A protein has these predicted regions:
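PAPS-dependent sulfotransferase catalytic domain
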Residues: 1-78, 82-107, 126, 134
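Conserved active-site carboxylates
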Residues: 111
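Globin-like tetrapyrrole-binding proteins
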Residues: 116-117
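C-terminal accessory extensions appended to soluble enzyme cores
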Residues: 124-149
């Protein structure tokens, strides 16, 4: 895992040429980050969804102009929860038709963030932090790691 991670971090090919690298990921997200105040862009962060799923769902519905009857919220929030999404992975995981996952439920893994910290040594983490600092402004880097706009 370490070598694959460092290849992902260190790849210097143009972001549009390499679809799976830190540079391409940051390049992709930076466009949305720059437009985050536009009406047609809504940024959601997994950590924020974990902390307040219902609040984030209500925020999204509000931004999209969707009126949800109050009595429907508990059902919607339950359906969008991690355990329920994982239980229904064959319809909720992305690209279920192509079977890119060994198991669709595996897409949902453990439902936690920061698992990579336990897999990487200090040198690999330092390389990641340095490369991210080259690629992303501090506010985007902070949001990528912690969420909350």
């Amino acid at each position: 895992p370490r070598d694959a991670f460092l290849h992902w971090v260190d790849d210097t090919a143009p972001p549009e040429a390499v679809p799976m690298s830190l540079a391409s990921t940051v390049h992709h997200l930076a466009g949305f980050w720059e437009g985050r105040d536009r009406d047609d862009i809504v940024l959601l962060h997994y950590d924020d969804l974990q902390v307040d799923l219902e609040g984030e769902m209500r925020r999204l519905a509000g931004r999209l102009g969707i009126d949800v009857p109050e009595e429907r919220w508990p059902t919607l929030v339950k359906a969008a929860g991690f355990d329920e999404m994982r239980r229904r992975a064959d319809v909720t995981a992305p690209d279920t038709e192509t079977r890119i996952w060994k198991s669709n439920a595996g897409f949902f893994n453990r439902g936690t963030t920061g698992q990579w910290r336990d897999l990487l040594d200090e040198e690999a983490l330092a390389r990641y932090q340095a490369r991210l600092a080259e690629l992303a402004p501090p506010d985007l880097a902070a949001w990528l790691h912690h969420g909350s706009l």
